[in-house]
Design a protein with these regions (language model features):
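Conserved hydrophobic positions within beta-strands
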Residues: 21-24, 77
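Short, conserved beta-turn/loop elements at beta-strand boundaries and strand-helix junctions
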Residues: 26-30, 82-85
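FAD-binding FR-type
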Residues: 42-147, 164, 289-291
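Short glycine-/acidic-enriched loop or helix-start segments at secondary-structure transitions
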Residues: 138, 158-160, 258-261
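Active-site beta-strand/loop microenvironment that shapes enzyme catalytic pockets
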Residues: 145-166, 183, 255
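Reductase modules of NAD(P)H-dependent flavoproteins
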Residues: 6-17, 32, 169-291
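Residue-level signal for short, function-critical loop segments
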Residues: 62, 97, 152, 182-184, ...
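Short, conserved phosphate/pyrophosphate- and ester-handling motifs at nucleotide-, phospho-/glycolipid
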Residues: 53, 154, 252
Length: 291
């Protein structure tokens, strides 16, 4: 496993292909202000192969007048539906419709790639690149403990990861802990009243899922990682000291500082936590996919 940080401009986007939208389904609650969609895409090139947890690039139309012919963004391969008779591969990606507020003018701007993808309909085509390497690799030890911490669309790769383990790895013995953070239950997807893709694993002895919610979502309070993690603090800290424990983090970049603060309390000091985290990272046992 590697921990190298790679920036978008470093990805090779020269090899491109077309994909057709098979379906676009809203998977966030209708009552939620967040719109998150699951897109099934059929790739026109039968020779292109994909694996779960790889990333694919999407080239949304840019602004040529500003020198940006395309707007490039990465999305995790969240699922691999069975191909139809054509033999063309199909992939699933999860997309959250994003908006941004300019801190100076207060003006709202739409995320280019996310709004482009969320507006696509069945039959539309999209230009893609990749696939790119797997960020979260499964350890060779079947008794390894896996701690997955995700927020927002960061849950998508973990859905694929957990599915792969319980479908394809029959002798998994280690603990699998999933921490899912959101402002409220309405903002959770793949784990809400409309659709809970993790429900099939709740009876597995090795699997546990924990929700970390904001105490006051309407007041923009941050996700309460401290509550969800502190409730299992002693056992979690002991797991982090086990050389067979691997931690995977996916979501918004601000999670890094939020989690560092929580784990510093768990460790007893910021310095002690940063030493432990450095050890985990050096051993490839702390891996982040942040955007």
């Amino acid at each position: 496993m590697t921990q190298a940080v790679k920036h978008l401009e470093e990805y090779d986007t020269q090899t491109r292909y077309q994909a057709t939208v098979v379906s676009s389904e809203r998977i966030s609650s209708e009552a939620s202000s967040d719109e998150i969609r699951e897109l099934v895409l059929e790739v026109d090139d039968p020779g292109t192969t994909f694996e779960l947890l790889q990333s694919v690039g999407v080239l949304a139309p840019g602004s040529p007048e500003f020198g940006n012919e395309h707007h490039f963004r990465l999305y995790s391969v969240a699922g691999l539906p069975e191909p139809e008779k054509s033999g063309r591969p199909r992939i699933e990606i999860a997309v959250k419709r994003m908006t941004y507020i300019d801190p100076y003018s207060g003006e709202e701007y739409k995320g280019i790639a996310s709004n482009y993808l969320c507006d696509l309909k069945a039959g539309d085509t999209v230009t893609m690149t990749g696939p790119y390497g797997i960020v979260f690799e499964l350890p060779e030890e079947r008794d390894a403990n896996l701690i997955m911490i995700g927020s927002g669309t960061g849950i998508a790769p973990f859905r694929a990861f957990v599915k792969h383990i319980y479908r394809d790895v029959k002798d998994w013995e280690g603990k699998i802990w999933l921490f899912y953070g959101a402002k409220s239950g309405l903002e959770m997807f793949y784990m809400n009243e409309k659709r809970d893709d993790f429900a099939q694993y709740y009876d597995e002895e090795t699997f546990q899922a924990f929700k970390a919610l904001s105490p006051r979502p309407n007041w923009a309070d941050p996700i309460a990682w401290d509550r969800a993690i502190a409730e299992r603090g002693e056992e979690l800290w002991n797991m982090l000291g086990d050389p067979k424990t691997y931690v995977y983090v996916a979501g918004m970049e601000k999670m890094r500082d939020e989690l560092d603060g929580v784990f510093a309390v768990l460790a007893g000091s910021k310095e002690k936590w940063l030493r432990r985290k450095a050890e985990l990272m050096a051993g490839g046992r702390w891996v982040e996919l942040l955007y």
